[in-house]
């Protein structure tokens, strides 16, 4: 073991520990896309439920998927799962009330 320490050219007094930069100097860490998509998903879910618009319910599912895909693992998953379940329930309720195929909005 002492032979290893004798042949090691690194000096232990020059070792510097890594310190991550603060989040305010790196704007890439504060990406607002998941939050915006979560909010849009909830808005479209409510429009799909209240106005019985199937395309709004499908857009809500799409926004929920984008929000889930762009979120960090450290974020709260309860809000994301509630948004996802709200969008799924909007699709289910809109098709239970009117089982006809969706007509394009244009």
Curated annotation (Swiss-Prot):
Q: Using the UniProt record, give the first listed, main subcellular location.
A: endoplasmic reticulum
Q: Which segments show compositional bias classed as Polar residues? A: 1-10
| Lumenal topology ranges | 52, 96-106
Instruction: List the ranges whose topology is Cytoplasmic.
Output: 2-32, 71-74
Give its localization.
Endoplasmic reticulum membrane
Q: Which GO terms describe its molecular function?
A: protein folding chaperone
Membrane topology (UniProt): Multi-pass membrane protein
- A GO cellular-component term linked to this record: multi-pass translocon complex
Question: Its biological function?
Answer: Component of the multi-pass translocon (MPT) complex that mediates insertion of multi-pass membrane proteins into the lipid bilayer of membranes. The MPT complex takes over after the SEC61 complex: following membrane insertion of the first few transmembrane segments of proteins by the SEC61 complex, the MPT complex occludes the lateral gate of the SEC61 complex to promote insertion of subsequent transmembrane regions.
Family per record: Belongs to the Asterix family.
Q: What is this protein called?
A: PAT complex subunit Asterix
